[in-house]
Amino acid sequence: MDKEKIISQMTLEEKAEMLTGKDFWSTKDFPNLGIRSLFLSDGPHGLRKQAAASDHLGLNASIPATCFPTASVMACSWDEELGERIGEALGEEAAALNVDVLLGPGLNIKRNPLCGRNFEYFSEDPYLAGKMAAAYVRGIQSKGVAACVKHFAANNREYRRMTSDSVIDERTLREIYLRGFEIAVKEGGAKCVMSAYNKVNGEFANENPHLLKEILREDWGFNGVVVTDWGGCNDRVDGLKCGNELEMPACKYAVEDVITAVEEGRIEESLLEESIRRLLELSEFTARKQVRAYDERAHHALAREAAEKSAVLLENDGILPLKAGTRVALVGDFAFLPRYQGAGSSVVNPTFLSTAEKVFASLRPSLSSSVSKPVSDSSAEILSSPDSVSSSDSALSSVSMSSSDSVSPSVSMSSSDSALSSDLVSSSLSAPPSLSAPPLSPAPSVPLSVSSFRKKEQETFPPCLAGCGEGRSYSLFRGIGRIFRSGGHRPCRHEDSAKSNRAVQSVGRGRK
């Protein structure tokens, strides 16, 4: 590819068009110039490419893919080699669906335990997060797919993430909040970085010269592409000045703003050409990927291996290893409908799903389970169900809020898992409760579950900022206020449409 020749043939309008999305997931192509479209797709622990047209968010409507353990689980393995193997599998699946840029891994530091996307991030340890992220990046990019580390930087909470300001002194910023990104860039060789929604020390991350120019480009030597988080562009011209090459998704105002800025002398056309040069280099790299089918069962087996190697056994009171013939009671909704991932932009529609129920069924006759349906998580109900527990030697407790709160796949999956059964690994086995114990009073409603936290936040915070699963979709659309200002987003369950529209109008950061 003769990049300089291509750039010399481009008009100012074409240059401006190349620096913003064509639709929700892809960049604009220019067949007459030999420039192809790039397709970007979630996500950190599994591909989330939607099944229909590309001009919508597509949550819960994605093509089935392997759901690997989330980053929060994988960090418990401390296994870089395993992380790189998962990265390779992610790269293979992305290439099979002709995805050029995989939006992950995420490695923001876990500063607040209530951050709704903590499951997407590795650790509160910047060194561990960086090493695991670098391994993922190497694996993904070995398959000709670019990895996009996110969210740069200090995006450590979801509450009001579009307008919040992370005020951090320089040493803390570099040693804690940026160290993981530095490792992913220098050791992993990440081709892309996604800028965050929030401000850092008073300036939005997507137009922050200290972050994007002085640290990322000059100090770390990053020569790849910086892309905005979806709807995270505050000022397109200022973003370009700082080296933010690509605004996503498409925005009709961006092209006009860039052209006007060049014509008025507020930005040099050569700066656009520098950004285009990086995008062409990214296109050249991803053009090498091999679009071919992958082995779904092998990838699911790898996901199970990763889950086993990441499991942490907190205590074993003589229960493990299980002996042949042991009868096990499966207690709790998650044994049958597990929460194996979070919600939002990273949700994966899995090709296969291994549940405790299926695993125990596949291990018969060595082991046998005495419960064929979930027993409520309430201790009182467990004790009042002697038929479910009294005949068992052990109880596997899968505590949850309720099965209705679990994330379930949106399309049918294969239920056959017997061929993939291996050694049972569990960190939650315990002896059955004594049935002679005195009756327990029902547990008080305290904010220990997600649902309780949601109710508390709904009462404490303004409408639509409750942080529920639907609210995350709301937060994203709120960031693209200039596109959905009329209220074209889906409101969360904590509000009605009228409140939603007013909230969008009051917090949207888009141009009027």
Model-derived features: where do they sit?
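Long, intrinsically disordered low-complexity tandem-repeat segments
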Residues: 368-372, 376-379, 384-430, 434-436, ...
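Glycoside hydrolase catalytic-domain context in secreted enzymes
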Residues: 1-367, 447-512
